[in-house]
Amino acid sequence: MNSFYSHLAGATVRWFDFQGQGDPIVFIHGLGCASSYDYPPVVSNPILNGRRALLIDLPGYGYSDKPLQFGYRIADQAAVVVEWLNKLQVSRCILYGHSMGGSVAIEAAQRLGKRVESLIVAEPNLYAGGGFYSCKIAGQTEDDFIANGYQSMLAEETSPGKGCLQNSAPWALWRGATSLVVGASPSWFERFIHLQCRKTLIYGSLSLPSQEAEDVETAGIALAVIPQAGHSMAWENPAALARVIAGLL
């Protein structure tokens, strides 16, 4: 595992660098998750033909530091991603973001401009309002969530993702969830459809139908579907996700 000190976050950010050929695929995880947990089974699949992959744990999550003073908004996380890629001197990349990470990837792609060869977002938050998970968190005050809601959420969680959740700072979860509920202006949907790089939306078959997916297809952007998977597609069908990503390179 690698690390660098983020001046924007005021903390150390950690990531995996799976060495390989070609422009790297940058994996950005969702709320309460960690790329170090979600994506090794995906990037190690032989179908990706040894493509270099960078798996970042955003500030507040996974192995990265969890500073109390950081904002954790989508824009804040996108700025750290760009700072990190600048530090690595990455001149061209493919951005992949899941859920909250999809929104982060969209904002990062705007900042990176022509350095982004392709943007792949998997069930991202494209509009204000959040989803079930983020609304449940943001429906509490930050103090209440830190004091009580976070532990209640941990107690209720039974999926393998509980390990990621318990390695997520409650203040990062609350501020990230609140940012998703508040949304952005212009919306992430508007930003996504107007980006000039190649773009693809990924959905798990069990998550369809979806209004957001229909809106993106109507805008002329390709939709790829992961069979036998829902929102947590990297856990549910990593081989199929690897195949879809490989087909987009």
Could you describe each region identified by the protein language model?
Residues 9-63:
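Conserved HGGG/HGGXW glycine-rich cap/lid loop of the alpha/beta-hydrolase fold
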Residues 29, 93, 97-102:
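Conserved alpha/beta-hydrolase "nucleophile elbow" surrounding the catalytic nucleophile
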Residues 103-111, 115-148:
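Flexible "cap/lid" loop of the alpha/beta hydrolase fold
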Residues 32, 37-39, 64-70, 130-133, ...:
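Conserved catalytic-core motifs of eukaryotic protein kinase domains, centered on the activation segment
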Residues 130-197:
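Conserved alpha/beta-hydrolase catalytic His-Asp/Glu region
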Residues 170-229, 234:
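Conserved serine/cysteine hydrolase catalytic core
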Residues 235-247:
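Post-His helix in hydrolase/transferase enzymes
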Residues 54-96, 243:
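Active-site loop/oxyanion-hole signature of alpha/beta-hydrolase fold enzymes
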